[in-house]
Structure formats: structure tokens, C-alpha cells
Amino acid sequence: MSNKISETLTFECETGNYHTFCPISCVAWLYQKIEDSFFLVVGTKTCGYFLQNALGVMIFAEPRYAMAELEEGDISAQLNDYKELKRLCLQIKKDRNPSVIIWIGTCTTEIIKMDLEGMAPKLENELGIPIVVARANGLDYAFTQGEDTVLAAMAHRCPEQNTLLDNKKVIQQDSTIQDFFSFLSLEKKEETRNNSSIKSKKHPPLVLFGSLPSTVASQLSSELKRQSVQVSGWLPAQRYTDLPSLGDQVYVCGVNPFLSRTATTLMRRRKCKLIGAPFPIGPDGTRAWIEKICSVFNIKTKDLEQREQQIWENLKDYLDLVRGKSVFFMGDNLLEISLARFLIRCGMIVYEIGIPYLDKRYQAAELLFLQNTCKSMGIPMPRIVEKPDNYNQIQRMRELQPDLAITGMAHANPLEARGINTKWSVEFTFAQIHGFTNARDVLELVTRPLRRNNNLENLGWNDLTKKEKQIKFN
């Protein structure tokens, strides 16, 4: 197989990567994001061990998630699934009283054909608590698709758009009442005037989908607000009771590349209009994301180029370190295309982008942006390999000798033993990487192995590393 990097984007498909993180890990960040929720993972002891170890939260700390462990009686159909789940949900209601209970199906529930979707509506009527069913099992391509499944299920529970119009009337009434009172301070009057000027530039409702920490979500909302774009809501909202209203007049835009199932549900089932934009990862991606949203609403952007330039100036110390370095993405979390595009813009050379699954329709804008970035930087286009075979990848890495490999945890130590610097791709999932201000965190993660190597060289250990490298590969 030729390893020459072409001048256009080339797509290949191999036999697949079988060493991936489990999608039920989405519970780790979703239970923190949706504050009034409770996640019930229906699976085996293995799932319980994974949650307890991977999430780093002990069960006796009483987090807002739990395991419904399947036993031999469940698998052999000796126990009544409905009664068992009802008992657990009654206990959850009594102890925690959440606004929603989210059942997470696993591989085992798929294999034994447990009818979670059939039981949920009956139990919901009995308990009076919404029960959302999401099959976040290991049959998906990547562990981040667990969030995609949960958000797609929650999209069905969002209220209709009419409610949104009623809320707008209430907001307008509230603002007129506030203006009426003369005891408002000058600052508050100025703020109210600014808000009314933003609202005066009417545009259809905009809902953003993708789970981000509250601080990052508010940063992106405020960046759009600077451009006179008002965000109507987020999916998921911080509280289940605050889910955004959806309908055929609502525009939706994603913030993560792994939410293709959610995007499809929003378009087909809820009749929303999808804004296909690059994802807000890195200063370049954030600017392109905002520009695309503004162009759809016929709003001219202001001072956006200067804002991006200012961020690049602040990243100068990191850019000097990564410029000219090469990176190889083995593929793990579906963030690879966006991260590769950002690193190319930083001056790095990307040999290959391995990705477990690529939805070319949902990521069309990102792929085009990647191509344009490569052309503007004068860097050859990387090969994109869907479902990469790890054995073939290691052969290619041996020939290309990248400075850094971004890989899943299963391959990190073996690659380090062969003298290749690695970075766990799962760290990019849990880190705050979206928006203008968080670009520094991305480069902090990428440069950590490179800075470690520089420190080792200063200690005179570089010769030992090189000798080991030759021994292992030859």
C-alpha cells in the first residue's frame, strides 16, 4: 500500500478497530450536565466495574446514576423484568426524586432482547416521572456515540414550537414591566436597552445541540450574542424541565462531530432545519461556525476576524513548539477530523486521520474546511481511513515516523514502547476544547508529550530512547 499523501482528500475503509471505549461512559458527563436527571444503566457486573473504575466515582458517594445488574434469573427469563425495574425506579423516586430517569441499555440488553422501550411508557404512567430509553451499547463504532443516542432519545421529548412563542410573549411583557419602573439603575437600563437591540434583529429560533460544560456553553452563546444571534436553547438543557422547543421554524446546529443520529432525528422527526457548519473547535473552527450561523440568518459579522487573530496571538508560544511536527490519528472518538484541521492550521503535518465512523453528510462542512485549510497552509492533504485496521496502521507509522500519535488507551503503551510519543484521544473528549478561549487547552494536551521529550533530551536520555526505537522496529 502506497503511503504517499495526495493533494486531495482520499477516503479509505479497512476492517475495523475492535479496541474501543464503551459508549455507556457518556453517563460520566451527561449526569453532571442534566442536573435533575438520574441515569440507570441496565447491564452486567462488567458494566458496573467499568462505570466505577472509568468514572472515578465510588458508588457510596451516591452520584446520580446507578447500575441495574442483570443476573442469571433475568437472562433465563425466570424473573419479571418489569417488576424489577419498577422496584428500582420506585426506590430512585423515593430517594432522589429526579425530573427524568434515563435508562441506558447495554450489550446484554440487546442480546437477550429486553424490551426497554415497551416497558418505559407503562412505568412512566405508573410513577408519573418521564423515562427516556437510550441504547448506548458497545455495538456502536465509537464511545462518544453514547451521547448521540441519549440526545436523539431526548429530542423526542422536547415540547412543540408553539410553547416557545408563548414564552417569547412572556419575556416581552417582563421587559416592558422592567422598563416601566423608574428606580432601575442606569446600568440596568443600559443593559435592557442592549438586550432589546439584540432582540430587535429578528431571526428564527436557534437551538444548539451537544453536551458541553455550562461555562463553555455560555461562552459560545455569548460569542453568538455579540453577533446579534440569540440562542433559544440547548439540547441537552441543564435541567430536563428546560428542554428547548422544536418545530419546522426552528434552526438547529451541532457543536460536536459525533451527533449525526441526533441531527437526523431533529430533521426527520421534529422537522427542524439543520445548519451544516464546521465545529467550534479551535479559533478557526469557532469563527467558521459563527460565520455560517450568521450567514443563514443574513446577519453581518462584526470584529470576528480580529477576535480570531487575537486568540492566535495568545497561542504563539504553543505554535512555535508544534510548527513542523507531524501527527498520526489512529481513530477513537470521532473528533479526529476537527482536531486534525485545527492542528494543520497550527502548522502541524497530519499524515493520517483514522476515524471509527464518518458521516460525510453531517461532517460535510468540516471536510470542506479541512481541505481549504490544507490548501491555505500549503500542506498535503491527509489520508482519511474509516474503520482503520490497527496492524496496518502500525506498519504505516513505522514508515512515516510521526512525532506524535493520538490514539485510544489500548494502544498507547505498546506504541510508547516502540518509541512513538502518544496522547490518549479520550482526554480530548473530557477536556474543554470548544470555543475561542479553550484552544489553549487543546494545544496544552497535544504539546505535553513533546515537552516531556524536550525535558528528557535536556537530561541526556534521548540516545537511550532512539536505541530502543531501533531495536523494537527492526
From Swiss-Prot:
GO terms for biological process: light-independent chlorophyll biosynthetic process; photosynthesis, dark reaction. Pathway: Porphyrin-containing compound metabolism; chlorophyll biosynthesis (light-independent). It is found in: Plastid, Chloroplast. One of its GO terms (molecular function) is ATP binding. The keyword ATP-binding applies. Belongs to the BchN/ChlN family. This is Light-independent protochlorophyllide reductase subunit N. The gene is chlN.
